[in-house]
Curated annotation (Swiss-Prot):
InterPro entries: Lentiviral_Vpr-like. The gene is tat. The lineage of its organism: Viruses, Riboviria, Pararnavirae, Artverviricota, Revtraviricetes. It comes from the Viruses. This is Probable Vpr-like protein. The keyword Cell cycle applies. GO terms for cellular component: host cell nucleus; virion component. Seems to function as a Vpr-like protein, since it mediates host cell cycle arrest in G2 phase. Cell cycle arrest creates a favorable environment for maximizing viral expression and production. It comes from Maedi visna virus (strain 1514 / clone LV1-1KS2) (MVV). Pfam families: Lentiviral_Tat. It is found in: Virion; Host nucleus.
């Protein structure tokens, strides 16, 4: 099952990498609601491989910079709400 970037609680003490986690989560949250369906499906498929997570975030950041005024297309960018490529072979238990 793929793991999307998620927000993790930070503390009062600045830790190395905390800002990167927040940046990744905020980027994914913003972009996954606005990108075209084909691109979202491609990124969700890439997130099944943990080695491609940085590439997905980098592509999402580039897309976000190029499409600053993009309208919201969907409420959520998760696999459950956006079944697509490879979804049929996955069993999701909540």
């Amino acid at each position: 099952m793929e793991e999307v970037p998620r927000r993790q609680p930070g503390g009062l003490v600045e830790a190395e990498g905390v800002f990167q986690v927040y940046e990744d989560w905020e980027c994914w949250d913003y972009v996954s609601q606005r990108v075209p369906d084909e691109r979202l499906q491609r990124w969700l498929a890439m997130l099944t491989n943990n080695q491609l997570r940085r590439q997905v975030i980098r592509e999402a950041q580039i897309w976000m910079w190029k499409h600053k005024g993009a309208a919201v297309r969907r409420n959520c960018g998760c696999r459950l709400c956006n079944p697509g490529w490879g979804s049929q072979v996955r069993n999701v238990e909540l």
